[in-house]
């Protein structure tokens, strides 16, 4: 099935040799076919940094029905050790010598349950790598829901996100399977203003909040973004100031809610709603069903905060090597549907801070601190405290040396209830975020633990 799309869409990949891509995919497919004829179905590690090699390898593996594990070529040794122990691959496709020289495992009888499966890496905020198990069908269901929601037949994608991640992979997959066009460039190239001569009005571009923030710092790039058909925004929560800035440039932003497990977005705010002032996640795409449940699994009514729960045709089968034992996927996110049917996400349930018996949601505190314009970055966590149970702790990057905890505390004094205001403040040069802008919460907790000396913290006593 995968190879057939080449014949229908010969010039889909802009800026690259489509014939070269097609030939490489067919060559790799023939190599796999020879193994299959010998009764060998290899588990493949795919860690190509070259775009053409990655796409050709992915298509060949899918066409041959071999289980393929998408990997970040830039993982460090500790991460690769995790991956090799978990996957035990039989074949490695990579242009990185340090990866290629890894010892492969002898082929054993393959569990037929994982044939034709596509394993996509996800680490969440824990930093531990695991793989969500997808198929061509689950990815196709995501594309179909996208097409119906935006009422399109062809999807053109301008991709600046890594193809091994669901955020980049689905941009390629949408264009490839709908006879659309694909442009793939490193984000740094776009940020430098080296942009191909294309009409953005026909394209979707996907960004994470930190990328949007950096592009908006350049008025020329902000104006360029405003010409796109739609600018999808996901990967991490966006802050209100950033959304307002995008709105001021008339950027057709579409904040999304989704994850690796759902093959990207299942809820999206349409650009028209965003430009009219909405700041929520939008409405559910046709291929998904989202419910808000109580702790006792009762469906909650409108405007009641509960646990976000998902059913979707695009839902992963499980985390490799295990399968989910039910179709209902309960998330760690808390949210609610408003009167108009829009999904609003409050934050992660596991990130909720209980301090002195009161519930505090970090996103609210972070938004108040960001609104002061005194910090370049901030993350709020709960630090174990013998008196409060947990103490609200702000870890921040100041805009300049003159900014102190006292300065910020004064600026938010009338913006947050007393119990929501941070009791501890930790200043860093930068926060540990991945390329998507997601915080490594475990690392931040370790940093907070190291700051045990009260003299190192500005305590709000």
Q: Where are each of the predicted segments found?
A:
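AMP-binding/adenylate-forming catalytic domain of the ANL superfamily
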Residues: 416-439
